């Protein structure tokens, strides 16, 4: 999307304002896609700052944190997984857009026009509304979106719970804009539209007064994330809630919202979170008789079944009582601290990988990605208290030492190398003993 040096042109002020769509057209006008800064990457420090700020404010106002550690780790893990494809290729949304622009555009609006800027703002938001709506109303699209709704908490970390598959369905809805809007303008607004949706994932902000009429707000988006019957298939807006008001999908927040999927998945394992609904579709597709019914399994709503309306029956959605207890890990606090520590180590190498992709060999890049995936899976197993978690963690720590020894994982601070070797050696010994104990006792065979 951009040239390597472009992100350095984004100031701290711009990075923060981009998250609230408070940028001037004149400061975000670029002639080519390569000039467009990576606003999302530049916003990473603000993500962290606002998550911590929300945590502090929640402690002050409610006397408790805004979420749970296990759920937050799973949400951030989903965000980590969703970014991995970008190590190899540009976003499909932008790639497909550029292709249509270069081959099929009908006219060319000026890239430096204020009118083009605002028209693109409306066009991208309108496209997002219809993508988001279809992501809830078409089962195969829902499989590429449901990961975002799987959290039973609602806080800023939930915003990071993104699907690795979503961009492979969303690109279609922006293609009409490519007939006349330059890719550089689109590349700016597709990022701003995403960034705006970060801060609305919070319970701290109750209402924004008159702005509730026009903008998508935390209150409106809380409804969207609810599994109460009145919340289902409502408030699809990205930035402007007017689309929901126009097309009849608006619902105001009027009772306690219970968050998550209508049928909670009960796991913190990141790839189960990402792909469990695809497995459900696969099973349902092959067990449903008739070509027409099989077609409906894919392209009607997630709640559809033979003899039911396209989006299913609302009375089949489980009632909520307000007493629902979110799925939580039974792991000890010490083990949770351990998972946070291992996650932090992984995240440091993850960010360093993105910063230095151009100078890393393909072998190193692939080995690192495998390590990242294994780390997130192992953390999920530990939080789920799976019987094979100790064995997986033993192998993961051994893999780290191997990659470290052969130079595929080098800490930014060279003096930490010895500390890492000691720490991971101790981890191998601990988890290795646990694995042997489980193997000899027979508990390893349990799920």
Swiss-Prot record:
It is found in: Endoplasmic reticulum membrane. It comes from the Eukaryota. GO terms for molecular function: glyceryl-ether monooxygenase activity; iron ion binding. The keyword Kinase does not apply. It is a multi-pass membrane protein. Its cofactor is Fe cation. A motif (Histidine box-2) lies at residues 145-149. Its main location: endoplasmic reticulum. InterPro entries: AGMP_C, Fatty_acid_hydroxylase, Sterol_desaturase/TMEM195. Residues 119-249 form the Fatty acid hydroxylase domain. It is an enzyme of class 1 (oxidoreductase). A motif (Histidine box-3) lies at residues 221-225. Keywords: Endoplasmic reticulum, Iron, Lipid metabolism, Membrane, Oxidoreductase, Transmembrane, Transmembrane helix. One of its GO terms (biological process) is membrane lipid metabolic process. A motif (Histidine box-1) lies at residues 132-136. PANTHER family: ALKYLGLYCEROL MONOOXYGENASE, STEROL DESATURASE-RELATED PROTEIN. Belongs to the sterol desaturase family. TMEM195 subfamily. This is Alkylglycerol monooxygenase.
């Amino acid at each position: 999307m951009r040239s390597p040096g472009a992100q350095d042109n984004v100031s701290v002020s711009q990075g923060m304002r981009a998250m609230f769509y408070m940028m001037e057209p004149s400061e975000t006008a670029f002639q080519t896609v390569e000039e467009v800064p990576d606003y999302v990457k530049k916003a990473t420090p603000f993500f962290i700052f606002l998550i911590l700020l929300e945590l502090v404010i929640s402690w002050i106002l409610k006397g408790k944190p805004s979420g749970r550690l296990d759920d937050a780790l799973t949400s951030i893990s989903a965000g980590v997984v969703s970014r991995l494809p970008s190590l190899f290729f540009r976003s499909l949304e932008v790639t497909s857009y550029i292709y249509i622009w270069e081959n099929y555009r009908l006219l060319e609006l000026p890239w430096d026009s204020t009118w083009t800027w605002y028209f693109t703002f409306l066009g991208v938001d309108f496209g997002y509304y219809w993508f988001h709506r279809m992501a809830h109303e078409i089962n195969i699209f829902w499989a590429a979106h449901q990961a975002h709704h799987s959290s039973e908490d609602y806080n800023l970390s939930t915003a990071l719970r993104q699907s690795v598959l979503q961009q492979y369905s969303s690109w279609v809805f922006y293609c009409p804009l490519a007939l006349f809007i330059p890719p550089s303008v689109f590349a700016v607004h597709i990022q701003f539209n995403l960034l705006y949706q970060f801060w609305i994932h919070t319970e701290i902000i109750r209402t924004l007064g008159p702005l509730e009429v026009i903008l998508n707000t935390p209150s409106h988006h809380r409804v969207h994330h609810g599994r109460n019957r009145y919340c289902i298939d409502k408030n699809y807006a990205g930035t402007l809630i007017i689309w929901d008001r126009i097309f009849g999908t608006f619902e105001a927040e009027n009772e306690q919202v219970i968050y998550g999927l209508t049928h909670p998945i009960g796991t913190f394992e990141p790839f189960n979170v990402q792909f469990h609904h695809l497995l459900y579709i696969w099973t349902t597709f092959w067990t449903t008789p008739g070509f027409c019914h099989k077609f409906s399994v894919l392209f009607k709503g997630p709640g559809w079944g033979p003899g039911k309306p396209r989006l299913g029956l609302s009375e089949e959605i489980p009632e909520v009582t307000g007493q629902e207890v979110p799925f939580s890990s039974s792991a000890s606090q010490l083990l949770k601290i351990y998972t946070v520590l291992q996650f932090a180590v992984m995240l440091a190498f993850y960010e360093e990988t993105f910063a230095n992709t151009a100078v890393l060999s393909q072998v190193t890049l692939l080995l690192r990605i495998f390590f990242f995936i294994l780390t997130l899976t192992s953390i999920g197993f530990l939080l789920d208290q799976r019987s094979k978690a100790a064995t997986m963690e033993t192998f993961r720590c051994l893999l780290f030492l191997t990659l470290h020894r052969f130079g595929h994982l080098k800490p930014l601070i060279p003096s930490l190398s010895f500390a890492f070797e000691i720490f991971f050696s101790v981890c191998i010994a601990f988890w290795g003993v646990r694995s042997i104990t489980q193997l000899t006792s027979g508990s390893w065979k349990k799920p």
